């Protein structure tokens, strides 16, 4: 009985500790390492948009057929470039987002990445 009580108490303590964890801000080299050579799955309007961030600073994205139908003519796929500046992930697509460059502050909590764009727009993603 004491072992069962101990296990229950430890489970509650660990779950409480996990729920108190705060997102860790990704910056500088940690941000670069988290993104470089990885695929980030951006959650947009109920869909996941995979964006591949190559180590050479190039990136590519491809929407699913369903997501592309909602893209209002922006195209199902695009390429661009990415870089880290002032502890933010910056990127510029060839045609998506009208080819404008935007920078994002990223923080990570477990498998979830929270992003806030320079204009205040925010959302979530996961790194695969």
Residue ranges and their predicted role:
Residues 7-15:
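Bacterial N-terminal signal peptides
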Residues 1-7:
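Bacterial N-terminal signal peptides that target proteins for export
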Residues 17-79, 88-128:
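Lipid interaction determinants
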């Amino acid at each position: 009985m004491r072992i069962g009580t101990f296990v229950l108490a430890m489970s509650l303590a660990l779950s409480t500790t996990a729920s108190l964890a705060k997102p860790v801000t990704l910056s500088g080299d940690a941000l670069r390492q988290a993104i470089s050579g990885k695929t980030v799955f951006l959650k947009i309007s109920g869909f996941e948009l995979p964006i591949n961030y190559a180590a050479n600073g190039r990136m590519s994205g491809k929407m699913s057929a369903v997501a592309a139908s909602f893209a209002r003519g922006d195209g199902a796929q695009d390429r661009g470039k990415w870089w880290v500046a002032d502890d933010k992930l910056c990127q510029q697509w060839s045609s998506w987002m009208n080819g404008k460059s935007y920078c994002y502050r990223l923080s990570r909590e477990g498998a979830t990445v929270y992003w806030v764009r320079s204009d205040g727009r925010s959302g979530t993603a996961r790194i695969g």
